[in-house]
């Protein structure tokens, strides 16, 4: 499906500190990068990778309207912890952790904007048993 996700930043050191803190509760670890202006994270044994770095075209990084990166979490607690880590690291709140049944039953998520304004989403889809279910397609409400 996906190979990788790339997020631009204006300050790599600041972004690395932010994403190190935010990815840890999700079980996503920073991995070695052979590129000086880029850092990379990955959940062990899984794809895709997250790359954060300075844009190749040397233009300032900026967020895209309607663009969002969503990271799966193993539990509601992991969503809560990732959200708290993001806010503590300077993220802007875009939606506190909570159920979002309009997306799907058991859909629990939180939204933040990172230090460069990129929208980030943490999500856990739990069945009625409370166990996390594998990622699946969302059924979005009709946009009228």
Please annotate each region the language model reported.
Residues 7-49:
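Core segments of cupin and vicinal oxygen chelate
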Residues 36, 66, 107:
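Short coil/loop residues immediately preceding or within conserved phosphate-binding loops
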Residues 104-105, 111, 122-129:
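Short beta->alpha transition motifs characteristic of CBS
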Residues 119:
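Glycine-rich acetyl-CoA-binding "A-motif" of GNAT/NAT acetyltransferases
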Residues 1-16, 125-144:
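N-terminal beta-strand motif that seeds the catalytic metal site of vicinal oxygen chelate
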Residues 43-81:
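Long, continuous compositionally biased terminal/linker segments
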Residues 9-14, 70-115:
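Vicinal oxygen chelate
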